[in-house]
Amino acid sequence: MKTYEVELRALISKEQHNSLLQHLNKLAEGEIDNAKTYTFLTSKLNIKVKNQITKNKAKITVKKGAEYQQQVDETELLINPKDVEKAVKLITALGFKKHISSIQKRINYVLDEITVSLKHETNWKYHIEAEIVVNTKTKIPVAKEKLKLFFKKLGIKPMTEEETRTLINSIRKKYGLEEI
């Protein structure tokens, strides 16, 4: 089934992270999802091979659209965690020569239809991400408004696509990848 991920993010301080952790733990049970991720980025594709260490799972995620976009067409394929290195080699063999490796510490919360993730990642540092997955493009605007309202209630300003693009380009430059 085709799905569309609608997502907003915000960079936060360690103090904000800790405060949000306490707040979200009162609203829902958090699920730890620490991972080692290999990200292959182009201007039109975001391919991630993710070894979800704490869940003993792994997956390949392909997002059509640039990493900075707030809504993308997303497809996932579950793989055996033992096959993560093979998946990275396969994607590299397809012409994606460089990738960004990162370690991510993540706690996910499900609040109604919103999945909220508090994260600390190698390149993004502390940040919060909130997403809604919809099955038709017509539902994207409503989902985006719900996410904006969620961030507003938290007192956090989500990043714009341009702010996200600037951050991603600085990360891409660090790893010798062309800017998008």
Which positions does each model-derived feature cover?
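N-terminal strand-loop-strand beta-hairpin
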Residues: 1-113, 157-180
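Mixed-charge, glycine-accented linear interaction segment located at domain edges/termini
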Residues: 136-167
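Conserved, surface-exposed functional patches that form binding/active-site neighborhoods
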Residues: 97-140
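Short, low-complexity, polar/charged sequence segments that are solvent-exposed and flexible
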Residues: 27-30, 79-82, 128, 135-138, ...
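A short, polar/proline- and glycine-enriched secondary-structure boundary/capping micro-motif
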Residues: 69-74, 129, 140-141
